[in-house]
């Protein structure tokens, strides 16, 4: 009887355990909002030394971060890279070696730099003998302007392309980083921003890099009133709720009337100062869970283009301040770094995940040869789950599982700096389906990856040309709006109509030294429903002449385009295309760049991805790489071959007579363009 009772008890416990398992369903074929783009970068202070840079900056490679923010801290002459402005107020000299060393090293691993120009250099301080003198307004604004121009010329000479300059850092934090007023800051911006653009016309300039959200509107008002360059607003948040910053920036930018202007969160940590001290939660395993918990909200803001996580290496000089991803003393990656690393291992195309109950949270993503899912547990109780992944796009591979919790992959608790996989075994994919059971400890993370046996690098560096600037477009600054996002590392554009049936997703890639042929490979998810007369899914190249003006453009489409479309782009020639070419398959064709270039072409183009009024819920990716002329099909027409002819003048408008540009569509689906003279 006793033995029977023990068996019954065991069965009861197994039943309860099975009932307690959370069901997790991942559908790899259903893309979801929002893509897991790698816009979460890092913020590095000047509270470092060269030894730490050499030791820890190479670790950036594993994070797949697309930006690093660096605060120069001029006037704080005891910090790294300072003083970089020497001489006198009338005759400044410069010592940029250390600053350039840090930024060049960062640029090796992050495509974009965000450089904060500030504070007042010692030669312009009203209290040069006092440590707090850096907070004061400059004594000579002409020299302040010249210094900013000189910095920008330095960034240009070092080829810090596709990058940003902030004017000052937290000027609204009274007696923390600035002793002046709002009007004083606006004058600082007014004298610095135009000088930055004069020194480096391709760089983006903005501010106010606010600790609070009070000064965004005033900066936009001043920029609009004076015609000042303002490419972005930036702000900071320490604590979980960053919505106040984003809402204030969006409201101010709506009044600015510049749909290209971006939002940057250039310092962010979900922890308050009381929580990021030594031995606090920021150092422990739970920081990984907190990192993932913060991501969905940030990803849901397409017009938030960069987030600089505070901080990369623990800041020196402040013994109790330990909010870095890297331990300053040992160089050991913390749990927070490992969470970043796992996020970098996730494909960008997000897919559907459904999690039972109301405790566990998660995200999933898919590529042709890789599927990942991350599940995190905000509760104080361990959770078990059973995960089913369906529509896996490959047949064989390896199943791997990582945990971050107080027993694994958290340096603070374990004092082990290695990054260890918990489980690795052949995947058992059956009918595109894989099942597994696992667990997530209290405030922990569980990461699942199934990788094809033929998997390639997830985010390979594509060396197609030099990206000098990315043109964003946000006509509707809401989370529901259409968007287009560009990854400069992989040369991939991800577009979505999101919840807008008649929205406009647009992004322009300004680049130099492109090859003569560009291979385009695309992928679409969702059903298109064309609306109105300006619908489109197309690519366009605008060519710049030696005068610096864009003088010629050619548009490529696969049938989702009206010849009578009147929409003009906000960049490039700013008119309808000069040439319109229909291709067989927009998801697989070659752009003959050299074939269309004007005689006075200087080597710079803007490659634009354009998707408009094609219904809600449609996603389109384009990936660009170097192509070959073999991908072009332009047969010579013969009798009986021609299916349709359409004539255009050189502004791209359709004509009814044989003069101008003729697009010939053949019965085999190929196209040919012919110039027909008068």
Predicted regions and their residues:
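Short carbohydrate-recognition loop motifs
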Residues: 482-502
């Amino acid at each position: 009887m006793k033995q029977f009772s023990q068996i019954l008890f065991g069965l009861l416990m197994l039943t309860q355990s099975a009932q307690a398992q959370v069901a997790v369903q991942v559908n790899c074929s259903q893309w979801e909002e929002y893509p897991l783009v790698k816009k979460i970068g890092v913020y590095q202070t000047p509270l470092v030394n060269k030894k730490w840079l050499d030791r820890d900056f190479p670790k950036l490679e594993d994070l797949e971060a697309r930006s690093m923010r660096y605060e120069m801290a001029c006037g704080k002459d005891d910090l790294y890279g300072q003083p970089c402005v020497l001489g006198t107020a009338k005759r400044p000299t410069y010592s940029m070696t250390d600053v350039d060393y840090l930024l060049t090293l960062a640029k090796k691993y992050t495509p974009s730099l965000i450089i904060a120009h500030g504070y007042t250099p010692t030669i312009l301080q009203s209290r040069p003998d006092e440590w707090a003198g850096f907070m004061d307004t400059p004594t000579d604004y002409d020299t302040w302007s010249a210094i900013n121009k000189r910095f920008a010329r330095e960034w240009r000479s070092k080829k810090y392309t596709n990058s940003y300059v902030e004017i000052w850092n937290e000027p609204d934090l009274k007696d923390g980083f600035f002793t002046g007023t709002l009007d004083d800051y606006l004058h600082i911006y007014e004298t610095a921003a135009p000088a930055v653009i004069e020194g480096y016309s391709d760089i983006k300039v903005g501010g106010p890099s606010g600790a609070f959200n009070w000064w965004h509107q005033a900066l936009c008002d001043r920029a609009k009133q004076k015609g000042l360059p303002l490419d972005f607003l930036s702000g900071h948040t320490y604590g979980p709720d960053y919505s106040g910053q984003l809402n204030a920036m969006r409201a101010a930018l709506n009044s600015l009337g510049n749909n290209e202007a971006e939002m940057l969160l250039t310092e962010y940590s979900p922890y308050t100062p009381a929580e990021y001290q030594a031995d606090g939660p920021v150092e422990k395993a739970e920081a990984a869970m907190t990192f993932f918990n913060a991501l969905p909200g940030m990803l849901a803001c397409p017009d938030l283009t960069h987030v600089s996580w505070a901080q990369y290496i623990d800041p020196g000089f402040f013994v109790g301040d330990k909010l870095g991803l890297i331990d300053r003393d040992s160089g050991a990656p913390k749990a927070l770094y490992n969470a970043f690393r796992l996020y970098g291992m996730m494909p960008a195309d997000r897919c559907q995940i459904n999690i039972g109950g109301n405790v566990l949270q998660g995200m999933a993503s898919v590529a042709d040869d890789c599927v990942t899912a991350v599940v995190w547990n905000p509760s104080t109780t361990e959770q078990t789950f059973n995960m089913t992944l369906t529509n896996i796009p490959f047949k064989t591979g390896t199943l791997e599982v990582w945990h971050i919790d107080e027993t694994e992959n958290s340096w603070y608790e374990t004092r082990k700096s290695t990054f260890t996989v918990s489980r690795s075994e052949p995947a058992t994919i059956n009918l595109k389906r894989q099942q597994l059971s696992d667990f997530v400890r209290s405030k922990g993370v569980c990461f699942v990856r199934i990788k094809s046996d033929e998997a390639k690098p997830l985010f390979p560096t594509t060396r197609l040309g030099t990206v000098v600037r990315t043109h964003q477009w946000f006509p509707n600054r809401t989370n529901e709006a259409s968007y287009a996002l560009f990854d400069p590392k992989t040369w991939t554009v991800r577009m979505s109509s999101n919840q807008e049936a008649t929205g406009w997703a647009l992004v322009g890639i300004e680049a130099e030294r492109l090859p003569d042929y560009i291979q385009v490979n695309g992928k679409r998810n969702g059903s298109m429903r064309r609306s109105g007369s300006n619908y489109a899914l197309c690519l366009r190249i605008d060519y710049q002449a030696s005068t610096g003006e864009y003088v010629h453009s050619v548009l490529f489409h696969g049938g989702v385009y009206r010849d009578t479309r009147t929409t003009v782009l906000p960049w490039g020639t700013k008119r309808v295309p000069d040439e319109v070419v229909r291709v067989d398959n927009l998801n697989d064709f070659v752009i003959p760049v050299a074939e269309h270039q004007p005689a006075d072409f200087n080597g710079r183009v803007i490659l634009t991805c354009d998707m408009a009024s094609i219904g809600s819920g449609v996603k389109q990716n384009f990936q660009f790489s170097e192509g070959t002329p073999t991908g072009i099909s332009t047969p010579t027409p013969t009798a009986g071959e021609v299916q349709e002819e359409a004539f255009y003048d050189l502004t791209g408008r359709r004509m009814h007579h044989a003069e101008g540009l003729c697009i010939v569509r053949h019965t085999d689906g190929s196209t040919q363009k012919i110039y027909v003279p008068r």
